[in-house]
Amino acid sequence: MNICRFMKILVRCFLCVTSLVLLLLPEVVLAQAPSEEASKSSTSQVWQVAVDGSGQFTLIQEAIEQASSGDTILIKAGTYPEDVTVHSKENLNIIGEGRDRVFITGEKRVGSLHIGKWPYGATNVMIQGLTVTQHGGLGVGIFNGSGVHLKQIHVKGMVFIQQVQGVYLEDCIIEGSETTGVAFANSTGTLVGNTIRHSDHGVAIGGNSEVTLRHNVIAHSLFEAVLITGQSKATLVQNTLVRNGGGIAFRDGTVATVRGNVIGFSAVGLSFSAQSHTTLAFNALYDNQANYLLEGTPPTPIPERAGKTDVVLAPGFVNPQEDDFRLRHDSSLLHIGDFSYLGALPPLSLSK
């Protein structure tokens, strides 16, 4: 009888302990979760590259190969004559001391800087504060991947983007390409606040791409500032396209929305294929030999493709002879439609 009672008590104790463990287990797991996340975030590292040996590496490529996802690479001032490739990396930041202090000049390969390489891409990689000089006609090549962000870099040559989603170019200077300044092939991206100059074409959007351009200055292109071909889609809002062979060319079956731009001092303002689809509004055209042309042999004027709210007005640039395309405070391009000003750059009264 005593043995039976003892067994019953033992079973009850076991059940109580088991219930208590089950009740406390979620709290234990939750208590451990933040520490695990903190452990993961604490593993992100900062690497330094310096040609004088004061960093952990003297070559940028060595630092990239060592870095893991989430790391940051800081590049000290100097010239780096090497071929740099970033691929199979996520959330990597590469930051130079400034585009007037850090120079990647390439060595043997076509393209001094590659982000992604077939079949490997790169995801959410940000590169900032350096200059890349073209090698073999290509400055920067971006292949595959997504979320590549170039900020405040100077590219002396072409930026070529192929099969990449969500590319973002911000406050960059791109110039001196032997072909195109920025070329998109079957990619999506956004260009904001860049200066693109002295190329054959400023920006070429081809294949099945979708690209937005806002507040860019594109000047001194041998041909069009922006060329859109294939089945691509483009949105251009408040850009200044001046001193080019042409402003914008809409080829093939392209679709585009074009609003608030300044297009001037060119042979042709806007050139259309018969198959293209465009929505134009509040664009200012000035001092072009022709504003709206239909492609053909020869091209013919097509004023019916103009936006109903487009204007033909002198922009009132500060000093166009010196490529200062800011607007004067008395510019005629202020407060037009829903824009406080047309073009890429604010008037002097609004400039900082």
Regions of interest found by a model, annotated:
Residues 304-352:
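C-terminal accessory segments
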Residues 83, 110-114, 138-139, 158, ...:
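Structural detector of coil-to-beta-strand junctions
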Residues 75, 82, 86, 96, ...:
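Extracellular beta-strand solenoids
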Residues 3-17:
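Bacterial N-terminal signal peptides that target proteins for export
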Residues 46-79, 85, 331-335, 347:
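Acidic Gly/Asp/Thr-rich repetitive segments characteristic of extracellular carbohydrate-active
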